[in-house]
A protein has these predicted regions:
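Long, hydrophobic alpha-helical transmembrane bundles and adjoining juxtamembrane helices/loops
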Residues: 3, 25, 38-65, 74-77, ...
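Intrinsic disorder/low-structure terminal segments
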Residues: 12-13, 123, 141, 199, ...
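Surface-exposed beta-strand/loop patches in noncatalytic accessory domains
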Residues: 25-72, 96-147, 163-193, 216-259, ...
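Generic N-terminal leader segments that precede the first folded domain
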Residues: 68, 73-84
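Short, surface-exposed loop/turn motifs at beta-strand boundaries within globular domains
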Residues: 70, 84-88, 101, 151, ...
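Noncatalytic modules at the cell exterior or secretory-pathway interfaces
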Residues: 86-92, 141-167, 207-212, 258-279
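Alpha-helical interaction segments
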Residues: 190, 258-260, 318, 781-782
């Protein structure tokens, strides 16, 4: 009897509750006509009854419903796989609820045959910013491999529920996206927000093997562009977009080159996601209070175009090699034309009296104004006329061992005599043995060759690892390419930027060959006319020239390694050998007229290593304190080098230096106002003024790119020294040969054009990856090279011509006596 009563009560309650649910739905959404089925659990107690409202929904219809702790709503979309949907169509679901809370959100679960998708409203991104309206595109099952949906009835179930005690209203809709596919060479516009990501499908047309996809926007709101395989699920939220495919952050523009061979179905998804903040794109972030997020809607345009064919790769490669091969042809022609105009034949034309003149006579004349010397020193230092026997107890100057001049007490006195004369000539600073000096300068290129091997191998290993990480993770923010002109080949993502450094290598090798040819001619000259050659022209030592050629080759290798994956972590690979080139050029200019007192190789390379170390510290830890310390060190080093150059190495730093300076100031106060070596003093005064200005500017302005700032200092000093050397050469009555003048003018043109392309700023590693991409530009040469690649070509030519200037600048002095060639 009791059981019968309970069954009757259950039926009554079921009918009553169903009528209440229908009345509520008709009240909330009276304008929508849909089929409703209500189900109640028959086993629970009355207070725990749970109601499920099933709605047979239609696409394009908006539903306004309520949910609470005791109810849920299931929207069912039934369709035919052939008639209703196809590969060009996708379904997009939108849910909004302004009354939902973080503690009791509206939960949305979408069930499809291939998987499920779920989210909550409000949607909290980064656990801070709340979005009360969410739109998601469902993964199209028709795009999946091995899909058997043709001629089959399909259904999509959307469950909406909430754990809120009070009724929570929400709005729900699902619509078809008929233009889901991106078309080739057609612009497509889209609107994206953090809670409303978008993605579209692109399918490679026939005969198209690679495409470049460009995304542009006028807004700088930060977003992510992701390329993913055709598979479910599609990762279209900020928290999971990094889990699949490749991606870039974007502010105003992004670009990706994609190859059909990397995708099974020759198709992919382009996923657009707006980030809740701009830190990843702009490097700064405006602080916002937690809670409702501000509007971050971004309008973007998407364009897909075909990339260059493989034939264009061959054109770009062979054009570059052919261009630099022209320099080899020109060099060969010039060498053939000047084959009969070498120095050895010209020396034969010098009269016997001019060749046999006693150099001690000119030495005494040139030093008479400074003070007298004993006759023994004059005899000791006078060379022997060819064919004449060497007097007993006397040694020829060219047979003096270097240790005799460097360590003996008498030799130190000779240094003080010769190097402190008011009028110095090259003969005064070319007294060491030619054989010993040649060995000393050979150390430069052998040491640099060793440094290049030990420095280059780890660099190559590191950048290859970067390239592998880029491919494995898909994070294209790792490398700062010009994505609008990045042509991959093999394992390299940007082959053109790597290959464009071929000019440094080819021209560096050519310069080494030219130096070797000149060195061979000089060795032949020494063998045939050694006594004559020793007294004429600038002393020829080619070790620094070989080192310059090796440095140019290594600049190409290191720059190529850097451009495998250019970023903040490996910038020094591209600049380290530029510092070395600048230092070697300055050392070579100084060595030309100071062959006996140039810096030793290990000292020079140690200083260059300290410069590179300082560049790294300046980029990583460029604080205000660092800039102050750097400015002080810069000015102090400038003074030390000035003293070393001014006194020709005849001074030393010890604990008595300040005492000596005080005595000089007290005893020769008036003479201090009139420098003894005016030319040197003027050069050093101008050089110190410029370097101090650089140091003060750095301490005050604190440039963001310390590496470029430091390189500018070295280049500025090198240009200043070259200009001074040429001016002093002309003021001394010396001439410059026409071929050297032509190369000087040509190098000015090439340097000007090279700097024009250098300042195009296509990328910048001291910005964020998205900020760097704002400067990306299309290719400008052969549809293969961008402006920075042209900079590589032009700067390689400019450096090569600059090296030739140093090699040929003093050729007019080959027939001039060394005791008549002034030192400056």
């Amino acid at each position: 009897m009791v059981v019968s009563v309970l069954r009757v009560l259950s039926v009554v309650l079921f009918i009553g509750t169903a009528s209440q649910g229908s009345s509520a739905n008709n009240t909330l959404d009276g304008e929508v006509d849909h089929h409703v089925r209500t189900v109640i659990s028959p086993y629970g107690e009355l207070k725990n009854d749970f109601q499920t409202l099933v709605v047979e929904a239609e696409f394009g219809t908006t539903y306004r419903e309520i949910v609470d702790l005791k109810s849920e709503i299931v929207f069912v979309y039934s369709f035919n796989g052939t008639k209703d949907l196809n590969e060009m169509t996708a379904v997009r679901v939108s849910v909004s609820s302004v009354n939902s809370t973080r503690s009791s959100p509206v939960m949305v679960v979408v069930r499809q045959r291939e998987g499920i998708m779920s989210w909550a409203v409000p949607l909290f991104i980064d656990y801070i910013y709340a979005y009360y309206s969410v739109s998601r595109t469902l993964c199209p099952i028709f795009h999946l491999p091995d899909s058997d949906t043709e001629d089959a009835e399909e259904a999509i179930y959307v469950d909406v529920s909430s754990m809120a005690v009070n009724a929570t209203p929400f709005t729900f809709s699902a619509e078809l996206l008929p233009n889901f596919e991106l078309r080739h060479n057609e612009m497509k516009n889209a609107t994206v927000s953090p809670s409303e990501p978008q993605y579209f499908m692109y399918k490679f047309p026939e005969n198209v093997t690679s495409v470049l996809i460009k995304v542009n926007s006028d807004s700088k709101t930060c977003m992510v562009v992701s390329i993913q395989e055709i598979r479910c699920p599609v990762y279209d939220l900020d928290r999971n977009v990094e889990f699949a495919g490749k991606y870039q952050t974007m502010s105003t523009q992004a670009a990706m080159l994609l190859q059909a061979s990397n995708y099974e179905r020759r198709a992919f998804y382009v996923v657009l996601i707006v980030k809740p903040f701009d830190l990843d794109c702009l490097g700064i972030e405006e602080i916002q209070t937690s809670g409702a997020a501000i509007s971050r809607v971004k309008n973007v345009s998407i364009f897909v175009e075909e990339t260059i064919p493989k034939s264009q790769y061959f054109k770009g490669i062979f054009a570059a090699v052919g261009f630099f091969s022209i320099f080899y042809v020109i060099a060969l022609v010039v060498l053939c034309c000047f084959h009969r105009c070498n120095t050895s034949q010209s020396l034969m034309d010098i009269s016997e009296s001019e060749r046999d003149i006693d150099s001690s006579h000119s030495f005494v004349q040139s030093s008479a104004s400074y003070g007298s010397m004993s006759s023994n020193i004059g005899k000791e230092m006078s060379p022997v006329v060819p064919g004449q026997a060497t007097p007993p107890g006397h040694r020829r100057v060219d047979s003096l061992d270097e240790s005799d001049l460097d360590f003996l007490h008498d030799a130190n006195e000779e240094k003080d005599i010769f190097r402190t004369k008011t009028a110095l000539f090259v003969s005064d600073l070319a007294r060491k043995s030619r054989k010993k000096l040649s060995k000393l300068y050979k150390v430069y290129h052998w040491n640099l060759f060793t440094i290049a091997i030990f420095y280059g191998l780890p660099v190559a290993q590191l950048v290859i690892t970067y390239q592998k990480v880029l491919v494995a993770t898909g994070n294209e923010d790792l490398c700062y390419y010009n994505f609008d002109c990045a042509h991959p080949l093999g394992v390299l993502s940007c082959f053109n930027s790597v290959f464009s450094n071929i000019g440094y290598v080819l021209l560096g090798i050519l310069f080494i060959l030219l130096v070797w040819h000149r060195d061979s001619l000089h060795k032949k000259l020494v063998r045939e006319h050694g006594d004559v050659e020793q007294r004429f022209g600038i002393p020829q030592h080619f070790g620094l020239f070989y080192a310059m050629g090796i440095a140019l080759v290594m600049e190409g290798v290191m720059s190529a390694c850097y451009h495998v994956c250019p970023n903040y972590s490996n910038f020094q690979f591209d600049t380290s050998f530029m510092y070395i080139i600048a230092c070697l050029c300055m050392l070579k200019i100084y060595q030309s007229r100071h062959p006996d007192i140039n810096a030793k190789a290990y000292q020079a390379y140690l200083c260059m290593a300290l410069v590179i170390f300082m560049a790294v510290i300046g980029v990583v830890y460029a604080t205000g304190l660092f800039w102050i310390i750097y400015a002080i060190v810069h000015m102090f080093v400038s003074l030390l080098l000035s003293a070393q150059i001014y006194y020709m190495g005849r001074w030393q730093i010890d604990r008595y230096i300040f005492k000596r300076l005080w005595y000089v100031f007290v005893t020769d106060c008036l003479k201090c106002a009139r420098p003894t070596y005016r030319d040197r003093f003027f050069l050093l005064l101008v050089g110190n003024a410029i370097n101090w200005a650089f140091a003060i500017y750095g301490a005050v302005q604190q440039p963001t790119d310390f590496a470029s700032y430091l390189l500018a200092i070295f280049i500025g000093n090198l240009l200043l020294y070259c200009l001074f050397y040429i001016l002093m050469k002309l003021l001394s009555g010396e001439k410059i040969k026409w071929i050297a003048i032509f190369i000087i003018l040509l190098s000015m043109v090439t340097w000007g054009s090279a700097l024009f392309f250098f300042f195009s700023h296509l990328t910048s590693w001291h910005k964020t990856p998205a900020g760097s991409r704002e400067g990306n530009r299309p290719c400008i040469l052969l549809e293969f090279y961008d402006a920075h690649d042209v900079w590589h070509f032009m700067s390689a030519v400019s450096l090569f011509l600059s090296f030739l200037i140093l090699l040929l600048l003093d050729d007019d002095l080959s027939l001039k006596r060394r005791d008549r060639i002034p030192v400056f």
